[in-house]
């Protein structure tokens, strides 16, 4: 079941995070989860201040994490609020498989999700602004990847963009004009 898949994923992630924390602690690394400011460099290394506490170290690793890009298109805010539009974080935690999934973006995340959700039964459409998938990937590799995903049932709208998100899908601007694509979920990737 999808619920078991999500539960297993969460357990694996927790175990990995715990392992990384233990390795960092064992190596004498101080981890600060807060906003910080690099003040200067001195004879001992880098001087950093966070929440009125100073740190001095020979090495500094800044791990900011990431957040999903939310495109500025009509209807996106309402779609996020209603749960129609989701980011990759929500997609990794869905316990119900959407019957139809529209994926905005044919990059790494979008293609991974297209592969997974098509293999568990979703009808998947990927909308990509470029004329090929997988961004800067070699064109031959991109074509082979697209063909493999199409064999799994994934549909592509290349050289296209989502113009508007509606209550039950999206209006997509393609080379042949506008097309309305119905979707249970829209992944912003």
Spans of features found by a protein language model:
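Rossmann-like dinucleotide-binding cores of NAD(P)H-dependent redox enzymes
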Residues: 6, 12-17, 21, 92-93, ...
């Amino acid at each position: 079941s999808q619920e078991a898949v999500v539960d297993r994923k969460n357990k694996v992630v927790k175990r990995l995070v715990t392992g990384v924390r233990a390795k960092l602690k064992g190596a004498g690394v101080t981890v600060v989860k807060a906003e910080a400011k690099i003040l200067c460099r001195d004879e001992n290394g880098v001087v950093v201040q966070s929440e009125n506490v100073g740190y001095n170290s020979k090495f500094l690793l800044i791990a900011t994490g990431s957040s999903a890009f939310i495109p500025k298109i009509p209807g996106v805010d309402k779609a996020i609020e209603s749960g129609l539009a989701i980011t990759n974080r929500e997609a990794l935690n869905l316990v119900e498989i959407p019957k139809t999934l529209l994926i905005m973006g044919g990059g790494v995340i979008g293609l991974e999700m297209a592969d997974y959700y098509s293999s568990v039964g979703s009808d998947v459409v990927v909308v990509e602004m470029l004329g090929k998938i997988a961004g800067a990937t070699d064109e031959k590799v991109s074509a082979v990847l697209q063909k493999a995903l199409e064999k799994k049932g994934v549909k592509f709208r290349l050289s296209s963009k989502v113009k508007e998100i509606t209550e039950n899908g999206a209006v997509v601007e393609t080379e042949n004009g506008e097309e309305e694509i119905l979707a249970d979920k829209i992944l912003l990737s």
